[in-house]
């Protein structure tokens, strides 16, 4: 995998607000920043939703609500299609400080569309996604789980792929 040296943002504190669906909207993130969070995560956003609302990025977007005053910020995305994930990430490149690929969510509705921890069952596809994402100028991080079950632990394999 071709790797570029990318700068992760310097944090004002070690407190990090994790992504929480239905909770970490822009108002809550701004409040947490005021209360000392060094960086905040957005709620996770599907690559399909980002692509659907691409013409509204930077305006009153119902999906991507990052504002300059809250930065640094991490935008977490999920999906299952290599090209769609890349296209969605490209839309927010430079508008967020880190793009985090969610490969850990076990929610049935996310698994049903092949996203989240479903990607742990196809490490070749995950590698292709990360190779594409690594061509962007924005730093990439990956949220993972140990595996899909106690007998299928793949965390070290995923970490090696992500490190490449």
What is the role of each PLM region?
Residues 31-34, 86-115, 123-164:
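Alpha/beta enzyme core
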Residues 18-21, 77, 118, 122, ...:
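Glycine- and other small-residue-rich loops at beta-strand/loop junctions that grip anionic moieties
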Residues 5-15:
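Extreme N-terminal starter segment of soluble prokaryotic enzymes
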């Amino acid at each position: 995998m071709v790797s570029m040296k990318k700068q992760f943002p310097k944090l004002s504190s070690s407190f990090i607000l994790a992504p929480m669906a239905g909770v970490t909207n822009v108002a809550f993130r701004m409040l947490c920043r005021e209360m000392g969070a060094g960086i905040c995560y957005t709620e996770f956003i599907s690559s399909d939703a980002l692509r659907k609302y691409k013409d509204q990025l930077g305006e009153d977007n119902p999906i991507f609500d990052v504002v300059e005053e809250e930065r640094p910020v991490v935008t977490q995305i999920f999906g299952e299609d290599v090209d769609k994930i890349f296209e969605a990430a490209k839309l927010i490149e430079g508008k967020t400080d880190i793009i985090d690929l969610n490969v850990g969510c076990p929610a049935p509705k996310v698994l049903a569309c092949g996203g989240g921890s479903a990607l742990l069952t196809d490490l070749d596809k995950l590698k292709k996604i990360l190779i594409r994402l690594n061509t962007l100028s924005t730093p990439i991080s990956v949220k993972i789980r140990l595996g899909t079950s106690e007998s299928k632990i793949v965390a070290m394999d995923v970490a090696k792929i992500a490190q490449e």
